[in-house]
Design a protein with these regions (language model features):
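Extended, solvent-exposed, turn-rich assembly/linker loops in the middle of proteins
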Residues: 122-199
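Short Gly/aromatic-enriched secondary-structure transition segments
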Residues: 55-63
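Alpha-helical scaffold segments that mediate packing/assembly in large oligomeric complexes
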Residues: 86-153, 275-284
Length: 284
């Protein structure tokens, strides 16, 4: 007869797996709330680079038209639906209904960032190539390209970076130089540029640094990072925002959770986006 009877205890509070749950990018672009319809039109207006003129020989001042560009953002419907039977909810460890709600919301938030990243990746102002090592000089090249295109270097600039590019920057003296930063690097939660699954607040060289775990080419010799102005990208979403209903089907005895949203993104000003291609394989 055994003299011990071991017991196994299962922790009821679940531990969230490592994945992105929040959108990091929607606050960095121009947003629009759509009341009704499947399209949102963003108007970009400028003078077209016009120069001042003098009065003509006929005594009249030459007139011109403004440069007005309407950019159409097409909204699509996006969903994520999780369903579990009553027995699975009853027999499984942890709060399965809470897990369903958490994961569906995360899926839609990742889709928001994916839409914005796809539009950024369509920019034609490019720097670097496969095998290019990330440097401060490369970043400054991007800054100059924006300045040459008359993009204001104001509080609306974002550097959306691969983890490896940030790793290279952090090894440079410029990263912690007081001339570049307005807070001490690594000083508490607000003093880090590393990804924290929530909107970033760290600024370097007067631009918002956003390290993102889901950018194109991650871990390869052709990683993509982006330097852009807020008005270069638009993102439209229905006024109701993200719907996250939950429910229970009595006839079939299953619980469900759904996240749904009508949304889309659009590149508005190509000159306001610089695409970096660099080698991050050494840190993959």
């Amino acid at each position: 007869m055994a003299d011990t009877a071991f017991q196994t205890q299962y922790r009821q509070e679940f531990i969230a797996g490592f994945e992105q749950h929040q959108s990091l990018l929607r606050e960095t672009v121009t947003t629009e709330a759509v009341i009704k319809g499947n399209q949102a039109v963003f108007l970009v207006a400028d003078s077209g680079g016009a120069a001042a003129v003098t009065r003509g020989v006929n005594g009249l001042i030459p007139a011109r038209a403004d440069n007005l560009t309407q950019n159409t953002c097409v909204l699509g419907e996006w969903h994520d639906l999780v369903r579990k039977t009553g027995f699975n909810v009853f027999a499984s460890q942890g709060s399965q209904r809470q897990i369903m709600q958490m994961t569906t919301t995360a899926v839609l938030n990742r889709k928001v960032d994916s839409q914005i990243t796809t539009e950024l990746n369509g920019g034609t102002v490019t720097i670097g190539a496969a095998g290019t090592i990330p440097t401060v000089s490369l970043f400054q090249n991007g800054r100059v390209k924006l300045s040459n295109a008359s993009v204001p270097w104001d509080s609306n600039i974002t550097f959306l970076t691969q983890p490896s590019y940030l790793a290279y920057l952090e090894q440079t003296p410029e990263f912690s130089n007081a001339q570049y930063v307005d807070m001490r690097p690594y000083n508490g939660d607000g003093g880090t540029a590393s990804w924290r699954d929530k909107p970033q607040a760290y600024r370097w060289r007067n631009c918002l640094l956003v390290e993102h775990p889901n950018l194109p080419g991650k871990g390869t010799t052709s990683e993509k990072s982006f330097l852009f102005h807020k008005t270069a990208i638009g993102h439209a979403m229905d006024t109701g925002g993200m719907a996250t209903p939950v429910g229970y089907n009595e006839e079939q005895d299953y619980s469900w959770a759904r996240a749904s949203c009508f949304m889309g993104a659009k590149l508005l000003q190509n000159s306001g986006v610089v695409v970096f291609t660099t080698d991050g394989s050494a840190y993959a």
